[in-house]
Amino acid sequence: MSYSLLSAVGSGGLVGFMLGLLGGGGSMLATPLLLYAVGVAQPHVAIGTGALAVSVNAFANFASHAIKGHVWWRCALVFSGLGVVGALLGSSLGKAFDGERLIFLFGLLMVVVGALMLKPRKAVAAKPAVGTFGLATALNYASSGLVDWVLAAEFIGGGVVGGVFGMLLATRLGAYKNVLNRLFAALIFTVAAYILYRSWGAFLPA
C-alpha cells in the first residue's frame, strides 16, 4: 500500500472522526491535510477535492444524527439554503485568486472558526450546512477540472470509517461537548498558525 493512499485514507479518517465527534469544525482540516500531509501540489485542487470529500462525509454522518433526533431542522434548512449562494460566489472568486494567497486567507478564516468553536452550540445544524456548502463548492471547482476524483474517493473511504468512530465516541462524551470544542479550537489555532507561516510569503513582492 503506497504512502499516498495511506495518507489520504488516514487524513480522511481524521476529518470524518472530527465531523462525527463535533459536528462541523473538522471540515476545516481537509484542505491543510491534503496540502501538507497528502502532498497535493495545487491549492485549488486541494480545496476542490477536500470540499467534495467533506460534503459526502458530512451527509453520511448527518444521517445518523438525524435518526437520533440531534438535528435542529429549521436552522439547518435555512442556513443550508442561504449558504449555497455564498458558497458558489465564494468558490468562483477563489478559483480566480492566486492559490498561495488563497491558502493564507484560509488560515485567517481558520482563526475565526477556532474562535467560534469556543462558543457553546445548539443541536446539530452544522452537518447539512457543511455538506451543502461543500457540495456547491466542489461542483464549482469540478467544472474547472480542479477535483482529484481518485484522491477524493480515498479520502471519503477513510472519512466514513472515521465518522463511525467519531459518532460512537460522541454518544459517550456528550457531557463534555464544550471541553471537546475548546480542545479542537486549540488544534484549529495551531494548524492555522502553521498555514500562515507556510504561506505568508505569497504576499511579498517578487
Which sequence ranges carry the predicted segments?
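Juxtamembrane transmembrane-helix boundary motif
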Residues: M1-M18, T31-P43, A63-P128, A142-A206
